């Protein structure tokens, strides 16, 4: 039972395959006959219209497949497109009933007339026309030509908001020799087709609207239509944020820290110059990417502003170091500086001497040696001049009486004791004067150092605020 059934199935399959092969053979014969009949007296050099005054309509559709390159420096967009053109050829029609219901054939595109649609704003010397692929010829004369093309078009790049910029690149297609009275061009859709677009790693495509334009040139009175596709691009900024912006922000916050570095370390100016050189390297990296235009990119403005801050901080650091190393030969700190800087600003900025804090009041304690010397000397000896010998002798007599323990009168050799005590008094006054001068000298130097430290701390917070505000403004403008 199964064997006859299998034989019957095999016979049916054989006859079906034979029938299909016979149909294909018949269609092939009719296609060859149709091709011979159509192109026997056909010329692809002339516009395929029966009336020479008639307008031939060409419909254009562009599909964006891939963005191959966006050269901002040379302002060239390289794109991979699929271009579809459709038009009617009045001389390539046939009756389907005469050719076994054959409704379409595919033939080489160079055998038929083709509209000379070119990319107006191409940016390369080589031809960017579509590839010579086959065309689909329908029985009613409708010709459809699908062909891929790699185009290089000029694109005006606005880098003002780089790396947060958006670009608009135009692709303008039109006939090169025919005017609008001979060949008219239309866009098949309101925008380019993005359904088969391959995502780009650097650019986001937000649309590709199409619009028809009719332009009249000064040389000719006839209109010249074209179809312009505007490619809306937005840059993916993550790469530039990580590699250019974040390092710049971190380096810019290092600039105020040069004021926090102790002046005695000798590295304040070196740090500022090193930061300035690092910013210069980043600036050169951005300059290599950007076109040489008058529009300065946003990140370039940030670099320039940061470099200006670093230059100013380095100059101020030199000034502060000059104040810090004021020695004994320098003038005393002015009164207004003592009040404004040492009294108020130092408290506001929490700048104190060693061992001093905001909770413990500052007491000026004299050295123990100086206190002992002044305790031994009467006030009259510290305030009177040396020409008052009479007063000095009286005081010396009192000292002799107290020190020698006499209860009665003064001994006869008082003059010798007076001479000794007078010499001793002069020595003590000299020592006290030296200690006082030494203290005044040290006090003068320490006051200038504290002034420099307060100014350092003041500029540090000022520059921190400026860098922070500048960074926020740049990010706000980018958004």
From Swiss-Prot:
Reactions performed catalytically: Ca(2+)(in) = Ca(2+)(out); Mg(2+)(in) = Mg(2+)(out); K(+)(in) = K(+)(out); Na(+)(in) = Na(+)(out)
GO molecular function, one term: calcium channel activity
Lipid metabolism found in the keyword field: no
InterPro entries: Neur_chan_lig-bd, Neur_chan_lig-bd_sf, Neur_channel, Neuro-gated_channel_TM_sf, Neuro_actylchol_rec, Neurotrans-gated_channel_TM, Neurotransmitter_ion_chnl_CS, Nicotinic_acetylcholine_rcpt
Matching Pfam families: Neur_chan_LBD (PF02931), Neur_chan_memb (PF02932)
KW Transferase (keyword) present: no
Assembly and binders: Forms homo- or heterooligomeric channels in conjunction with CHRNA10. The native outer hair cell receptor may be composed of CHRNA9:CHRNA10 heterooligomers. Found in the stoichiometric form (CHRNA9)2:(CHRNA10)3.
Note: The heterooligomeric receptor composed of CHRNA9 and CHRNA10 has an atypical pharmacological profile, binding several non-nicotinic ligands including strychnine (a glycine receptor antagonist) and atropine (a muscarinic acetylcholine receptor antagonist).
Protein name per its UniProtKB record: Neuronal acetylcholine receptor subunit alpha-9
Source organism of this protein record: Rattus norvegicus (Rat)
């Amino acid at each position: 039972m199964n064997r006859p059934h299998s034989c019957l199935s095999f016979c049916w399959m054989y006859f079906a395959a034979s029938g299909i092969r016979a149909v294909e053979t018949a269609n092939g014969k009719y296609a060859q006959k149709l091709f011979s009949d159509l192109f026997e007296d056909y010329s692809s050099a002339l516009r395929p219209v029966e009336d020479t005054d008639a307008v031939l309509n060409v419909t254009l559709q562009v599909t964006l497949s891939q963005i191959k390159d966006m050269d901002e420096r040379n302002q060239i967009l390289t794109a991979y497109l699929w271009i579809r053109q459709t038009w009617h050829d009045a001389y390539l029609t046939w009756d389907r009933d005469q050719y076994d219901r054959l409704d379409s054939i595919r033939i080489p595109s160079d055998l038929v007339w083709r509209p000379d649609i070119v990319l107006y704003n191409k940016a390369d010397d080589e031809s960017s026309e579509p590839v010579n692929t086959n065309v689909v010829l329908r029985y009613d004369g409708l010709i459809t030509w699908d062909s891929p093309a790699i185009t290089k078009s000029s694109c005006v790049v606005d880098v003002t908001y780089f790396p947060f910029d958006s670009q608009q690149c135009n692709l303008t297609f039109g006939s090169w020799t025919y005017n609008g009275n001979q060949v008219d061009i239309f866009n098949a859709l309101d925008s380019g087709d993005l359904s088969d677009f391959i995502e780009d790693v650097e650019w986001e495509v937000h649309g590709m609207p199409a619009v028809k334009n009719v332009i009249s040139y000064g040389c000719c009175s006839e209109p010249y239509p074209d179809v312009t596709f505007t490619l809306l691009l937005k840059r993916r900024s993550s790469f530039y944020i990580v590699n250019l912006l974040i390092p710049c922000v971190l380096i810019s916050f290092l600039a105020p820290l040069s004021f926090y570095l102790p002046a005695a370390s000798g590295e304040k100016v070196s740090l500022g110059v090193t930061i300035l050189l690092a910013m210069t390297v980043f600036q050169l990296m951005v300059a290599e990417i950007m076109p040489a235009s008058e529009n300065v990119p946003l990140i370039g403005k940030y670099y320039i502003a940061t470099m200006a801050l670093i230059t100013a901080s380095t100059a101020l650091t030199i000034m502060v170091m000059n104040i810090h190393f004021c020695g004994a030969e320098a003038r005393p700190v002015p009164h207004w500086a003592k009040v404004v800087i040492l009294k108020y600003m130092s408290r506001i900025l929490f700048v104190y001497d060693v061992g001093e804090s905001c909770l413990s009041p500052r007491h000026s304690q004299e050295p123990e040696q100086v206190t002992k010397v002044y305790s031994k000397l009467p006030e009259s000896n510290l305030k009177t001049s040396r020409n008052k010998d009479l007063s000095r002798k009286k005081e010396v007599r009192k000292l002799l009486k107290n020190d020698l323990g006499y209860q009665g009168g003064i001994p006869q050799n008082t003059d010798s004791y007076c001479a000794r005590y007078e010499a001793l008094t002069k020595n003590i006054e000299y020592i006290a004067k030296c200690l006082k001068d030494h203290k005044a000298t040290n006090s003068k130097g320490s006051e200038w150092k504290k002034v420099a430290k307060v100014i350092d701390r003041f500029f540090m917070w000022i520059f921190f605020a400026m860098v922070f505000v500048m960074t926020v403004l740049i990010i706000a403008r980018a958004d």
